[in-house]
Design a protein with these regions (language model features):
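Alpha-helical transmembrane segments in inner-membrane proteins
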Residues: 2-392
Length: 392
């Protein structure tokens, strides 16, 4: 093949990958609008756009000024009847718009944005973990990070229930419980990282360490549920479901800050991670320090996972399925696989949120349940496809 034909083939492949990435992003945008529109009180698209244009800091003083002006009008002169009626309609529209702004920006927007950011984090973390461990079944969920977060949250809920008047405060559920889950996730990752430093950071060492962490924290979690009061046990179970109803603007800020912190390192290691898919020997022959790359990627995965699960609870299968879907579409090139895995993770999570709201309009089914139910057949498909490749 000539240089021109090779360059043309490369450009066609790149254009195809960019098209798939753009198409997936459009699907995510459509699902995000659907997620904003669904809920106990339906919201048509034109109302959504009205509330979006009004913004989160909608100026309520305009209606207050207008109401004072209305109070100064004469009782009901014949010439002002139409004006009176028009201002009454104006106030009705103002009140309705304030309600729309409250629902959209105060309740639904934080949940949708948190779902997108959590999907980004889990998709990126899952692809990096499968790459550094050379294991198609590796994910933040299967290696115990989510179990560690669940134990941290259960610990905070249980001890909060022992302190009268503390657990009932809103700040406890929005700050202390997520902080405990975040800290425990980082602690679990630190334990596995320490094992990798003391030994070599081989995939086998990291996988065995992750499995040990998974069973350890699951057993501690079960012990806490056994010892907890019925009220605390119910709160623990609700947290473990994985629910976007727990999202807030705080979870949006933490998720966004974590992504901004980790993305420069992820982008820098893109070529190294792509090369690592060829095997350790090939990567080392090209000058890549494999152990250092694995340890650095493991730290990034721990931060992404901690930010993802600390606020909304355990979300299974997203970090496992999204990387496989991304690689099946764009291949092993991490320049395209990483962003597509992130967007695909968000598509799965927001899609699960929409399905949960449609199936149970009064109270949305937790997304953790939807992703688990949908993830099982996908996992079987991955296993069967891997078996066919091995046989071939």
């Amino acid at each position: 093949m000539t240089h021109a034909s090779l360059h043309g083939s490369y450009r066609r492949g790149t254009d195809r990958r960019l098209f798939l990435l753009a198409a997936t992003a459009l699907v995510l945008l459509a699902l995000a609008l659907a997620d904003l529109a669904t809920g106990p009180s339906g919201m048509p698209l034109d109302d959504i756009f009205k509330a979006l244009r009004a913004g989160p800091f909608y100026d309520k003083s305009r209606s207050e000024v207008a109401s004072r002006a209305l109070a100064l009008l004469p009782a009901a002169p014949a010439g002002l009847e139409s004006l009176w009626q028009g201002m009454g309609e104006f106030f009705g529209d103002e009140a309705r718009l304030r309600k729309l702004v409250t629902i959209l920006w105060g309740l639904r927007m934080p949940q949708t944005l948190t779902g997108i950011l959590v999907g980004f984090c889990l998709g990126l973390a899952g692809l990096q973990m499968q790459t550094i461990l050379a294991n198609p079944l590796a994910s933040p969920f299967t290696l115990g990070f989510s179990a560690a977060a669940g134990f941290g949250a259960a610990l905070a809920i249980m001890f909060g229930g022992m302190m009268p008047g503390v657990a009932g405060h809103a700040w406890y559920g929005f700050i202390i419980v997520p902080a405990a889950a975040f800290a425990m996730t980082i602690g679990a990752c630190g334990l596995i990282y320490l094992i990798a430093v003391l030994r070599s950071a081989t995939p086998a060492i990291l996988v065995l360490g992750g499995i040990a962490v998974l069973f350890f924290f699951q057993s501690l979690q079960s012990l806490l549920q056994f010892l907890a009061t019925p009220e605390a046990s119910q709160q623990i179970v609700f947290w473990l479901f994985g629910n976007l109803l727990k999202a807030s603007w705080t979870s949006v800020a933490v998720g966004l800050a974590t992504l901004v912190l980790c993305l420069p390192f992820i982008i820098r290691d893109t070529w190294a991670l792509t090369t690592l898919r060829l095997g350790d020997a090939n990567a080392m022959s090209l000058g890549i320090h494999v152990d250092r790359l694995r340890r650095r990627s493991f730290i990034i995965v721990s931060l992404l996972t901690a930010a993802a699960v600390s606020f909304i609870g355990t979300i299974g299968f997203v970090g496992l399925i999204a990387p496989h879907m991304a690689r099946s579409l764009v291949g092993e090139d991490h320049r395209f696989a990483l962003p597509l895995a992130a967007v695909t993770g968000a598509v799965i999570l927001i899609g699960a949120s929409v399905i949960g709201k449609i199936l149970s309009p009064g109270g949305a089914i937790p997304v953790g349940i939807i992703t688990a139910v949908a993830g099982v057949p996908m996992l079987f498909g991955i296993i069967l496809r891997s078996g066919q490749r091995s046989a071939a």
